[in-house]
Amino acid sequence: MGRTPWSALFFARIPGRLANYSDVTLYLRRLPHDYETEQPVFLTWRLYDSLPPDRAFPTAALASGQAFVAMDRLLDEARAGAFHLRQPAVADMIVEAIQYNGNILGHYASHAFVVMPNHVHLLATPAVALPKLTKSLKGITAKRAYAMLALTGRSFWQEESYDHLVRHAREFEKIRNYIEGNPVRAGLVKEASEYRWSSAGWLMTQGATGGSPADQGVRPTSAV
């Protein structure tokens, strides 16, 4: 039996209940940072002060899907930190940068994303090496956030990002549902499509003419 092409899986909208924390199981494998291929990856990065040092997970431990889900839950339940991404203008800017870096710069094809109050998830197929992809996204968004929020003298993003290889179609769908269901699990909305800073919400608001976040070709209103 031939291998199903990823292009046939990228934006298939498979119905089903979004996972909550109790039934989420992710089996994730950490990638080498020189990884570059046409196979999707699951990326996560968070604000610098989003977790206190005694609650942050060592990077190596996050190769475990169970540890990653536990960290994500801590981020969703966090009460400390600046929560800069809770501000609509900042969250809008992050979404614009995700679209711009994928659609205009061509660094990746975006399949799912969500901007949470203190972290970001992105499911994408890289067209460039991961260091270039993450450096571009984190660098330009940090620079613009500094200007928007008049921040000085501190980091915006945690230096380390988390990247995991998507190994097959079932995992692809599970991770996409996990990403788009994050605002529901965190209690921010009742339905994934209600959250405007995600691919699910984007499809409802920006994608009314059809297509997907990766093929709409929407350029940010201001240069990124």
Segments from the language model and where they lie:
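Short catalytic/metal-binding and nucleic-acid-binding patches
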Residues: 1-224
